[in-house]
Amino acid sequence: MEPEIKIVNVVVSTQIGTDIDLEYAADILDNAEYEPEQFPGLVCRLSDPKVALLIFRSGKLNCTGAKSKEDAEIAIKKIIKELKEAGMEIIDNPVVSVQNMVATTELGMEPNLDDISTLECTEYEPEQFPGLVYRLSDPKVVVLIFGSGKVVITGLKVIEDAYIAFDKISATLKELEQELY
């Protein structure tokens, strides 16, 4: 049975120009904050799609909080449109690349994290963090497994890797269960 995997955060980056005047951009963009003594970039929050965009003087733009790459691209297009309408030199259709995606799913059981922690590439320090950290090399992702059966997969570049990672973890847990019980 295919697990229900839900993307909860997509982080993308792009280049929208060079030498961006962040003070001016902060004045023209709604919901923008620019406090260079606290953070070197301009932070702009949109409500539809609900994302945060970080714009740096170098022209680099990061978008976080999107539920899909498409939502991030919509948000970036909105910001580009506003900046261009204000007379700023901005790249029209910048290449957007996914830096990280975070997905959640469920194992469908309550795993024994102490047992799983005997596997290679795992870390489990319940006094410090309630989840078991399982680092996979192919795909190169980090899987957090909680005692409730909830799973968080991070480090994704494509959604397909979430399914591959989940299948690998599920198979490994089945093998471990057969060895132990």
Swiss-Prot record:
What keywords would UniProt list here? Answer: DNA-binding, Repeat, Transcription, Transcription regulation
Gene3D superfamilies reported for this sequence: TATA-Binding Protein
Tell whether Repeat is among the UniProt keywords: yes
Give residue ranges of the sequence repeats.
Answer: 7-83, 98-173
PROSITE patterns annotated for this entry? Answer: TFIID
Molecular-function GO terms, alphabetical: DNA binding; DNA-binding transcription factor activity
* GO aspect biological process, one term: DNA-templated transcription initiation
Q: Which InterPro entries match?
A: TBP (IPR000814), TBP_archaea (IPR033711), TBP_CS (IPR030491), TBP_dom_sf (IPR012295)
CDD domains in the record: TBP_archaea (cd04518)
A Pfam family annotated for this UniProt entry:
TBP
Which family does the UniProt entry place this protein in?
Belongs to the TBP family.
Name the job this protein performs. Answer: General factor that plays a role in the activation of archaeal genes transcribed by RNA polymerase. Binds specifically to the TATA box promoter element which lies close to the position of transcription initiation.
Tell me which NCBIfam families the record gives: PRK00394.1-2 (NF001593), PRK00394.1-3 (NF001594)
Q: Output this protein's name.
A: TATA-box-binding protein
Q: Which organism is it from?
A: Methanococcus vannielii (strain ATCC 35089 / DSM 1224 / JCM 13029 / OCM 148 / SB)
